[in-house]
């Protein structure tokens, strides 16, 4: 089975590639803006059995050439993924999350391919609510990132309903892995605890009272594998385990036997321009669509412990 992972150098691209690599009947191609940088990154994480293809997702001629190879599955993971940064990079966020996706859908329609297309969406597409979220919940994003993801969500759905393409939306809640960029909250928390342990360093944070479902990326990718064999639809992939930033912070510092209050400070420069205080999923309703027997194994303190051990072992600070 031929798989194309668009934007394959991020945590989802790397994680899904590693899983598919273990299966004998999958051939994986990854698109990237920089062959040399991505090759070095994949080598670092022990990912060898993939082919790299240079691609500008805004260039439809390049996409046409690539898709003429007739892939069985296409995973669209490209895109600027920071809600906070999206306020500063509005055009880049829109181009990468929406226009690139639009180009792929239009070329798939033009070639009349039977390919299954998976668009990575986000919990940021929903409105601010205390209710548990399912795929039909009200959608009203508050950031350019969320708006760009909602545009691609709606377009992916449109191409499925009107043009009968085999298109899927994968609505992903917060995800963590060894490959996650260190600027995000959970890696920052883990690294702050390590720095406090090693050198008594104090780290500045924004608001830590936000509540999220932090997932382990590999578990979400295993759910994606389940979705691959479902009828084209829209799915929420999250574990239903909610924790505040403070809870995750306490897990990290307690693990290293430290009092976090001595090593963190609140700094307004880290506040997001706009943010949701709470994001939680209607886990049982969502998971029944994918695999009713599935249960998460890695969440909460387990995520924190895994990351700290990995960072310490690989001397990442």
Sequence positions of predicted segments:
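Conserved catalytic-site region of short-chain dehydrogenase/reductase
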Residues: 83-84, 119-133, 144-150, 175-179
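Conserved beta-loop-beta element that borders a ligand/cofactor-binding pocket
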Residues: 116, 122, 154-178, 187-190, ...
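C-terminal substrate-binding subdomain of Rossmann-fold SDR/epimerase-dehydratase oxidoreductases
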Residues: 18, 30-32, 193-317
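N-terminal Rossmann NAD(P)H-binding glycine-rich loop of SDR-like oxidoreductase domains
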Residues: 3-23
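Conserved Rossmann-fold NAD(P)-dependent oxidoreductase catalytic core, especially the SDR/UDP-sugar
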Residues: 76, 102-142
């Amino acid at each position: 089975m031929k798989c194309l992972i668009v934007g394959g150098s991020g945590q989802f691209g790397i994680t899904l590639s590693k899983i598919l690599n273990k299966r004998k009947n999958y051939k994986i191609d990854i698109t990237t803006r920089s062959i040399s940088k991505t090759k070095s990154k994949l080598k670092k994480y022990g990912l060898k059995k993939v082919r790299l293809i240079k691609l500008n997702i805004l260039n439809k001629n390049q996409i046409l050439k690539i898709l003429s190879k007739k892939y069985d599955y296409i995973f669209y993971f490209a895109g600027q993924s920071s809600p906070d940064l999206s306020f500063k990079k509005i055009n880049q966020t829109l181009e990468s999350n929406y226009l690139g996706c639009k180009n792929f859908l239009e070329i798939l329609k033009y070639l009349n391919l039977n390919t299954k297309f998976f668009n990575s969406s986000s919990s940021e597409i929903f409105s601010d609510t205390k209710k548990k979220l399912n795929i039909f919940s009200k959608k009203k994003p508050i950031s350019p990132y969320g708006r760009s993801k909602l545009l691609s969500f709606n377009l992916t759905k449109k191409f499925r309903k009107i043009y009968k393409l085999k298109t899927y939306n994968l609505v992903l809640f917060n995800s963590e892995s060894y490959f996650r960029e260190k600027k995000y909250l959970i890696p920052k928390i883990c690294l702050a605890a390590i720095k406090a342990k090693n050198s008594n360093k104090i780290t500045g944070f924004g608001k830590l009272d936000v509540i999220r479902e932090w997932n382990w990326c590999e578990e979400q990718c295993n759910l994606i594998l389940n979705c691959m064999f479902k009828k084209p639809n829209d799915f929420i992939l999250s574990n239903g385990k909610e924790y505040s930033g403070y809870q995750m912070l306490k897990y990290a510092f307690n693990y290293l036997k430290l009092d976090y209050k001595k090593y963190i400070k609140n700094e307004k420069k880290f506040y997001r321009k706009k943010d949701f205080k709470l994001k939680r999923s209607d886990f049982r309703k969502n998971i029944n669509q994918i695999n009713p027997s599935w249960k998460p194994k890695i969440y909460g303190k387990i995520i924190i412990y895994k990351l700290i051990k990995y960072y310490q072992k690989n001397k990442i600070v």
